[in-house]
Curated annotation (Swiss-Prot):
Membrane topology note: Single-pass membrane protein
Pfam families: PSI_PsaJ
Keyword Transmembrane among record annotations: yes
Stretches assigned to coiled coil: none
Gene (UniProt): psaJ
Principal location: membrane
Protein name (record): Photosystem I reaction center subunit IX
One GO CC annotation: photosystem I
PANTHER family: PHOTOSYSTEM I REACTION CENTER SUBUNIT IX, PTHR36082
Amino acid sequence: MKHFLTYLSTAPVLAAIWMTITAGILIEFNRFYPDLLFHPL
């Protein structure tokens, strides 16, 4: 278990998890409010 936690705390793994969560939030936001991500200038 200690080695698994060490693996999870490495930078590439944390970056992948963070990008996955961010993409999920953006996808769900875009699903409910499809016009708010692209504001006309």
